[in-house]
């Protein structure tokens, strides 16, 4: 049996997910020998740019569907929600276009792999004070390039698209704000995830995968475990697996 694949498609929060304590690395550990995490994270990207490159990001489907991934996570919105009149305005995507871009990405994935589970993840909350302390480009306005209120609008839009498309969604924006002192507990720079924030994403995505029948208990290992190897005839165990 070939090991299943799970694609992680998103912006920098996905690109960094294989770092120490990252949510992608934790998923890889949870499903080791059962599913491979395929990282497709692109720092700074919004849904407009993601839609532009989506055909280059994912492999062409085989005719028999045998290469279909078990799941794809789609995690965009933090950059779309940049305010258009502020220092990162070039990353901004209007809310109505954000929703349409998400629909188009979901439609692309459904057409390519009809049996693949798709999980949307909302943008995280924003700590505006920290964004002023950790700007990524010159910011002379004294105003944050993102606000938590606007991030919440994009989170709600993401949830609406998931409901419309009848797919799973993780409401990260709401979930993180349930944690005391989330601004410093879940985020290290007002946007990107701390170790605690990564743990939240990992647990929420693992929960959604389980609901889709892609949990650690649901997937088989791809070759015999050491305890399944017959000490008297080791090679026979591989023939019978």
Curated annotation (Swiss-Prot):
SUPFAM superfamilies per record: SGNH hydrolase (SSF52266)
Protein source organism: Arabidopsis thaliana
A molecular function (GO) term: hydrolase activity, acting on ester bonds
Residues at the active site: 12, 189, 192
EC number(s) reported in the record: 3.1.1.-
InterPro entries associated with the record: GDSL, Iah1-like, SGNH_hydro_sf
Protein name, as recorded: GDSL esterase/lipase At5g45920
Family, as annotated: Belongs to the 'GDSL' lipolytic enzyme family.
